[in-house]
Amino acid sequence: ADESALAQTKGCLACHNPEKKVVGPAYGWVAKKYAGQAGAEAKLVAKVMAGGQGVWAKQLGAEIPMPANNVTKEEATRLVKWVLSLKQIDYK
């Protein structure tokens, strides 16, 4: 399955890019931040579905909320696994 196409269809790429900050954090930042963390996948699936804010305010220079997304749990899980598999990028 092509998760980048799913990310495009679901509107994720309006605010995210694998390699650079757009409105939200680069997916490579997310991959680095959560690498090896127990429970990271479930935490991020919940965040993709319900929305969230506050994690990346320092790096983004503002408190930018991510809205709840119109995805199923299965779609959110596919997207999160894809994001976590991407090349990790420093977010200093």
Curated annotation (Swiss-Prot):
One of its GO terms (biological process) is photosynthesis. Binds 1 heme c group covalently per subunit. The keyword Transmembrane does not apply. Pfam families: Cytochrom_C. Heme c binds at residues 12, 15-16, 66. One of its GO terms (molecular function) is heme binding. Belongs to the cytochrome c family. Cytochrome c2 is found mainly in purple, non-sulfur, photosynthetic bacteria where it functions as the electron donor to the oxidized bacteriochlorophyll in the photophosphorylation pathway. However, it may also have a role in the respiratory chain and is found in some non-photosynthetic bacteria. This is Cytochrome c2. The lineage of its organism: Bacteria, Pseudomonadati, Pseudomonadota, Betaproteobacteria, Rhodocyclales.
